[in-house]
Amino acid sequence: MKVIAAFLLAKLGGNENPTSNDLKKILESVGAEIDETKIDLLFSLIKDHDVTELIAAGREKMSALSSGGPAVAMVAGGGGGGAASAAEPVAESKKKVEEVKDESSDDAGMMGLFD
């Protein structure tokens, strides 16, 4: 993620064709760890592609994701517990879903992108 951010910063700064040395300078300026393999991988994946096209394709893929939240598995009540024991797992799963929704609102839809 840091390598992509450095690449985009170089592009935003007016460098139309950033090099790996440009990315290293940006990463060094903020004290970030430099991973040569990730830099090389980025350049191999984006060669012959326009950044705006890549962003548009990513945006399209993100919009295709379900925004309904995480799937909750319903637990069926075991043997002789009756309706009371079956209702307990449902109540617990609803509580867990609410907790997950509260945590995800902090990310503002970024799904932990910068963790």
From Swiss-Prot:
Function: Plays an important role in the elongation step of protein synthesis.
CDD domains: Ribosomal_P2
UniProt name for this protein: Large ribosomal subunit protein P2x
Keywords tagged on the record: Phosphoprotein, Ribonucleoprotein, Ribosomal protein
GO biological-process terms attached to the record: cytoplasmic translational elongation
Gene3D superfamilies: 1.10.10.1410
PTM annotation (Phosphoserine): residues: 104-105
InterPro entries referenced in this protein's UniProt entry, alphabetically: P1/P2_N_sf, Ribosomal_P1/P2, Ribosomal_P2
Species this chain originates from: Arabidopsis thaliana
Membrane-spanning segments: none
Family: Belongs to the eukaryotic ribosomal protein P1/P2 family.
The protein's assembly and partners: P1 and P2 exist as dimers at the large ribosomal subunit.
GO molecular function annotation: structural constituent of ribosome
Biased composition regions of type Basic and acidic residues, renumbered to the chain: 91-103
Region (Disordered): 78-115
GO cellular component: cytosolic large ribosomal subunit; cytosolic ribosome
